[in-house]
């Protein structure tokens, strides 16, 4: 007995023509879930020792503005990627940060100011600013997801 008919059937089953097409909404949902999972994983790592000082959640207004500015998303991520290299025991966060660029929105204009500054080796500052940055990014993605679902 030949296995040729079985191979032909298998090829038909896995060929792209017979699979359900990916819609923009499906693709957006999948990418949003992946980004959300990466953000959650980083935040979990940020909650591990060394523990932050009491002023963990305090960010000045200028830092908040810089971290929320859409046109600074990529430069800010680059600043976090640079700063994470100066921290001990941060390799897990570093590897996730490297995968985060597809989650960032496209800049609509050139940045008008410098990205966030993070002191080398300062876990507390790094943690405080990165957590705010990630929460802002996550909120923005949730809003985009809601808008795309309303449109479709």
From Swiss-Prot:
Q: Has UniProt tagged this entry with the keyword Kinase?
A: no
Q: Name one GO molecular function term.
A: interleukin-3 receptor binding
Q: Keywords on this record?
A: Cytokine, Disulfide bond, Glycoprotein, Growth factor, Secreted, Signal
| Disulfide-bond pairs as recorded | 35-103
**Tissue specificity as recorded in UniProt:** Activated T-cells, mast cells, natural killer cells.
The positions flagged as glycosylation sites are 34, 89
Top-level division of the source organism's lineage: Eukaryota
What's its job?
Granulocyte/macrophage colony-stimulating factors are cytokines that act in hematopoiesis by controlling the production, differentiation, and function of 2 related white cell populations of the blood, the granulocytes and the monocytes-macrophages.
The protein's name is: Interleukin-3
Print the organism lineage. Answer: Eukaryota, Metazoa, Chordata, Craniata, Vertebrata
Q: Which gene encodes it?
A: IL3
């Amino acid at each position: 007995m030949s296995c040729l008919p079985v191979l032909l059937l298998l090829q038909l089953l896995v060929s792209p023509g017979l699979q359900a097409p990916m819609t923009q909404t499906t693709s957006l949902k999948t990418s949003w879930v992946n980004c959300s999972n990466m953000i959650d994983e980083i935040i979990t790592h940020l909650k591990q020792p060394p523990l932050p000082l009491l002023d963990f959640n305090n960010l000045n207004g200028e830092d908040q503005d810089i971290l929320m500015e859409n046109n600074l998303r990529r430069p800010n991520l680059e600043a976090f990627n640079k700063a994470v290299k100066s921290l001990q025991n941060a390799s897990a966060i570093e590897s996730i940060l490297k995968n985060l660029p597809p989650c960032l929105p496209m800049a609509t204009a050139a940045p008008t100011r410098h990205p966030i500054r993070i002191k080398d080796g300062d876990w507390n500052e790094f943690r405080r600013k990165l957590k705010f940055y990630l929460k802002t990014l996550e909120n923005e993605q949730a809003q985009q997801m809601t808008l795309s679902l309303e449109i479709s």
